[in-house]
Amino acid sequence: MGNFPLIYGFRELVAGAGFVAGVTVSGRALVKHEEDGWWVYGVEPGGIAERGDNEQEAYLNFKQSLREVLADSAVLNSSFQSFRADVEDLGRQRNEVWAAEWEIAREALRTGELKPEGAFAELPRETGAVLTGISALELPKPTAEDNAVETTLLAAA
């Protein structure tokens, strides 16, 4: 199988100096099988790539790295406002090389040239526009409902 265009999303609670934030991440990634294993390359946000022995492990490692970047941002920023600006900026970062390959892979999936295998065969397909970004909402009085963690994995087609 060639490159695979992935759309992902999740929510995360992030605590910083005097604040708790609900963070929503919506992104695109390119999944590739390389000689040394499976890799997930961040398209939006860009700048993050992780490896695994299979596609699921690579994605989980990628997601964990993104979570660590969010946690690091909370440590480095002294206020919610600066944290929000930082993570929103991260969400706008785009890797143009992987973006071009992602579009090629999406078109290959649409035309049937790319045949999803394994875990990819079961993913629902998204054929519309893909909105990406990171948003943060300050939670002045966090509740148990704020713990809801949504995870979205879609194939871009």
Predicted segment positions?
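Short aromatic-glycine-(Arg/Gly/Cys) micro-motifs in beta-strand/loop hairpins
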Residues: 25-46
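Short, charged, surface-exposed hinge/linker loops at domain edges
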Residues: 1-30, 60-157
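A short, exposed loop/beta-hairpin motif centered on an aromatic-Gly-Thr core
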Residues: 43-57
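Generic structural signal for short, flexible, solvent-exposed coil/loop and linker residues
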Residues: 18-20, 37-39, 55
